[in-house]
């Protein structure tokens, strides 16, 4: 009996030519946490900070036919004009995408792939803010389809304005 799987074997339920997304690797590309006012910012009774969130999705094809997708999440908390904390994570994934029409590839890369990466990036931010002495910062689920549509509309509006 052997535990090796033949290279030509396909994952359960996947047949040749069937559309699918496989995550081959996921990784932290960049990670930063700043806590400039510690320990003073951690005092009890301090006013709730204002938090500014940012999200970016980027994808690029590789020569080997795979795709790298990066999800960048950033959060900056300020109280009385001073940074309380600033966290930024770029979480990446290496994807194999098969059976997807060329016109559908961009939405898959910038909506579905970030959706797979989001829980891991969210956990990193939650963990590091807790380790920084703050309550865990839990990012609400992100509507990646809405973000994609808004950015696409904005880009098309800029192209029309520049024509």
Curated annotation (Swiss-Prot):
The keyword Ion transport does not apply. Keywords: Chaperone, Cytoplasm, Protein transport, Translocation, Transport. GO terms for cellular component: cytoplasm. One of its GO terms (biological process) is protein transport. The keyword Iron-sulfur does not apply. GO terms for molecular function: unfolded protein binding. It is found in: Cytoplasm. Belongs to the SecB family. Homotetramer, a dimer of dimers. One homotetramer interacts with 1 SecA dimer. One of the proteins required for the normal export of preproteins out of the cell cytoplasm. It is a molecular chaperone that binds to a subset of precursor proteins, maintaining them in a translocation-competent state. It also specifically binds to its receptor SecA. This is Protein-export protein SecB. It comes from Caulobacter vibrioides (strain NA1000 / CB15N).
């Amino acid at each position: 009996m052997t535990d090796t799987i033949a290279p030509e074997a396909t994952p359960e339920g996947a047949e040749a030519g069937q559309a699918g997304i496989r995550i081959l690797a996921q990784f932290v590309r960049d990670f930063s946490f700043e806590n400039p006012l510690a320990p003073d910012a951690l005092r009890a009774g301090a006013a709730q900070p204002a938090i500014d969130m940012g999200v970016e999705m980027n994808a690029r094809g590789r020569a080997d036919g795979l795709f790298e997708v990066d999800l960048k999440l950033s959060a900056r908390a300020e109280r009385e004009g001073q940074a309380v904390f600033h966290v930024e994570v770029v979480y990446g994934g290496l994807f194999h995408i098969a059976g997807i029409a060329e016109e559908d590839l961009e939405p898959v890369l910038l909506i579905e792939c970030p959706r797979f990466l989001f829980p891991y990036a969210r956990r990193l931010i939650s963990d590091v803010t807790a380790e920084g002495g703050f309550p865990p910062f839990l990012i609400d689920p992100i509507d990646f389809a809405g973000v994609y549509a808004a950015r696409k509309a904005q880009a098309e509006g800029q192209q029309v304005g520049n024509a």
